[in-house]
Amino acid sequence: MTSSRRRFGFTLVELLVVIAIIGILIGLLLPAVQAAREAARRMQCTNNLKQLGLSAQNFHDVHNHIPPIAQNNSKFSRVSWLVMILPYVEQSAAWNEFASGGNLRLSTAGNPSSSRTDAKVDPYKAAPWEWDIACWYVSMPAKICPSDPSGADSAAQWFPGRTNYRASLGDATIASCYFGPDGKKSRGPFCVDNGGETRDFSYITDGTSNTLMFAEVPTHATTGGSDDKTLNIKTGILTGKNPQWASTCVGFQDPNDVNSFVSSVVTRPWLGRRWADGMYIYSSFNTVLPPNSVHCIYSTSDAERSIVTPGSYHSGGVNVSFCDGSVRFISETIDCGDSSANNDDYRGKGGKSPYGVWGAIGTANAGETDITL
């Protein structure tokens, strides 16, 4: 008697069908997984801005003024608002290093254990542009947006440390902090401490819920590749007398990529570098051009007037915090008014912003209280 053995298993066709189904499922699920990850990163970015806003309020409670955007006085080196709030973002150790001075210099960039005993730093005088200062390499999650792919802090000379968060100058374009009187021309809540020049919350007559405090700006990416935004800064746009320099900046924008300049433009990789430096090109932003668009500076010097535009790796807009501590997501299509307006007509003066709703939420006391976002 002949017995037959029945075999169980997939035929080649069945196996290919199963593989195809699995591939389709992965294709359907992967975007959802990526979207969930980005949502988590965006939420963390929001929390970072909330923490920075709370730290600024705590600083105000202790010192009776908003942290200066930069220091330009006999006590401090040219440090930024981020340095001043270190004790309020759980970074007292880094602040104490900066405040006490001593053996802060490193023989190996980014290696705090490589301190040099032959080169001391005076208290409060560590220079924010020097790569070999130990406290500039503090690990501070609140200064980095997790969606930014730029990687670890830079240890390059002149560019130690990075940050995604900046303080508001409003719609003013002003020269850098060590030029003294220009520090008073900020139309936002921040100003430069030129030896006693400070602002408190009473300065914000437009309302703390209507006035920006912080926003994110992508760092100059080092990864390369298709996800790498061109985040350089166009230099030398005002070699002549051209008051419409916001529209001049837009004129160099790549028509196929609003984040980039046309290839002939000379740029500098300054965005997101030197988190401890109070110079405006490193520490602040302006509400002049739409979020996620280009950046320009008056000349080839990082000390000159600049337009730094908030932007992000979040799709469609940018996270910002207001002076009341709230955080919102602002669309890159927000009303930005007239980019051809002469910025000199508003810099350091009163009057409503010519740059639409975007400019209005940048000003602190321009009589712009009826704002709808």
For each predicted feature, which ranges?
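N-terminal secretory signal peptides that target proteins for export/translocation
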Residues: 1-5
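N-terminal single-pass transmembrane signal-anchor helix
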Residues: 7-41, 45, 51
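Internal low-complexity, small-residue/proline-rich segments
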Residues: 35-373
